Amino acid sequence: MAVSLSASARRRTAKLRRHVRVRKKVSGTPIRPRLVVTRSSRHIYAQVIDDVAGHTLASASTLEDGLRASDGDKSAKAREVGRLVAERARAAGIDAVVFDRGGRTYHGRIAALADAAREGGLNF
């Protein structure tokens, strides 16, 4: 007998499955750290992480004072976070990263952040 799930439970399960599938393949090294993108309904966060040492090398989010007060839609703020994290990673001597979309589909705010990080000089 099959158990039927609600629509939200199916989405949550699918996201978890995607996240596990991506994390099996993606790992950050000191030479090529992992750019992790985390998204909520209101904010977006980006961190550059060296998984070997377990350290965050650079980060940016919409919770920062300059971005929190800025006008614009959520995609514009995601682009600004991407630009900021690329700038901070480059200042830390990082040119190449592995992109970890955190189980989210590569669309909308996730894609906007990734494109802005590429324009900022990070190679994926």
Swiss-Prot record:
InterPro entries: Ribosomal_uL18_bac-type, Ribosomal_uL18_bac/euk. The keyword rRNA-binding applies. The keyword Ribonucleoprotein applies. Keywords: Ribonucleoprotein, Ribosomal protein, RNA-binding, rRNA-binding. One of its GO terms (cellular component) is cytosolic large ribosomal subunit. One of its GO terms (biological process) is translation. GO terms for molecular function: 5S rRNA binding; structural constituent of ribosome. This is one of the proteins that bind and probably mediate the attachment of the 5S RNA into the large ribosomal subunit, where it forms part of the central protuberance. NCBIfam families: L18_bact. Belongs to the universal ribosomal protein uL18 family. Part of the 50S ribosomal subunit; part of the 5S rRNA/L5/L18/L25 subcomplex. Contacts the 5S and 23S rRNAs. This is Large ribosomal subunit protein uL18.
